[in-house]
A protein has these predicted regions:
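An active-site-proximal "capping" alpha-helix that borders the catalytic cofactor pocket
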Residues: 147-167
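A generic secondary-structure signal for well-formed alpha-helical elements
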Residues: 111-115, 165-168
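Auxiliary, metal-adjacent structural segments of Zn-dependent hydrolase domains
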Residues: 2, 10-84, 93, 143, ...
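Short pre-active-site segment immediately N-terminal to the catalytic Zn-binding motif
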Residues: 86-103
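Pan-zinc metallopeptidase signature
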Residues: 168-277
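Non-catalytic, well-ordered alpha-helical scaffold segments
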Residues: 101, 155-158, 203
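Catalytic glutamate of the conserved HExxH
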Residues: 102, 106-110, 114
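Post-HEXXH active-site segment of zinc metalloproteases
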Residues: 95-97, 112-147
């Protein structure tokens, strides 16, 4: 496998060296894993240049996603091969173990989701019909499926990292993400009275819950503590919705599907039609 590391101007040498070390930690554990023949790791100095790059890429390729600066590190395969981005300015002040977990996480995505099929979604007529019957037009359905796809991919990556002995970084990362859910709370308050918008924000809340449930399922003891932390972090969410998300998180793991697209569509059907959500 060929790895190209692109270090932009003025990135601190200590920072770039540490990022490469954390990248190698995953690569050394995953020698048996089949990966694309090429991986590009891009290390940015400032948020301004990082965001400018993504704006240009989206415009050229017609890609529609969320705001990349919301994440500690990002991955994509828009050009047909896996790319990972991390910005020094973005992670300044973030605990070292959390940034390590974020890098492990994105390398995991490169292994598992390094092809365009994981970033382009099909919306079958039956799924669109189900969405329409529950108040989701195509634009809203796309948002719902987008957030669900993030959660499912994160579930797969976190479980894999835990299985190869790198779960400690994911525990740190998830704990950090649960330390502040004020934005999620605000989103819930805005969406709670709209049946269609509720589905979208609840799909977004699965980003942390699905990985936690995955680690519980393979016997990671600390994951149960993290599960309690999730309940506390989302204490403002009504019990009906919390219970519905918990049941969904367990059920989606057991969905039988041959491809990611098939699993995503079946999960979307369940999420849209679930009366508890």
């Amino acid at each position: 496998m060929q790895i190209q590391i692109v270090i932009h101007e003025e990135v601190d040498e200590t920072f770039s060296t540490q990022i490469q070390k954390w990248t190698k930690e995953v690569l050394d554990k995953a020698e048996y894993f089949s990966l694309s023949a090429y991986l590009r790791l891009m290390i940015w100095k400032t948020l301004e240049e990082f965001q400018a790059f993504y704006r240009k890429e989206k415009e050229e390729l017609g890609v529609v996603t969320g705001e990349e600066a919301d994440f500690l590190a990002t991955h994509d395969a828009w050009r047909g091969y896996p790319r990972i981005h991390i910005c020094q300015e973005r992670v300044e002040g973030i605990p070292r173990g959390v940034v390590q977990g974020a890098m492990h996480h994105e390398i995991g995505h490169a292994f598992h989701h390094g092809r365009t099929e994981f970033y382009t979604f099909r919306f079958s007529s039956s799924l669109q019909q189900a969405g329409h019957s529950h108040g989701l037009n195509l634009a809203l359905l796309q948002q719902c499926v987008y957030f669900l796809s993030i959660a499912i991919k994160d579930q797969e990556v976190v479980q894999w990292l835990a299985e190869i002995g790198l779960g400690f970084g994911q525990l740190a990362l998830l704990g950090y993400l649960l330390s502040d859910t004020e934005e999620e709370h605000q989103a819930w308050e805005l969406a709670r009275d709209s049946h269609s918008l509720r589905k979208i924000v609840l799909a977004a809340f699965l980003k942390t819950l699905l990985p936690i449930e995955a680690m519980i399922s393979i016997g990671i003891p600390e994951a149960k503590i993290l599960r309690n932390q999730w309940d506390e972090a989302y204490g403002w969410l009504p019990e009906k919705e919390k219970e519905g998300l918990s049941l969904f998180a367990v059920s989606i793991k057991n969905v039988e599907a041959k491809t990611f697209q098939e699993r995503l569509e079946r999960g979307a059907f369940r999420l849209i039609s679930d009366a508890c959500l």
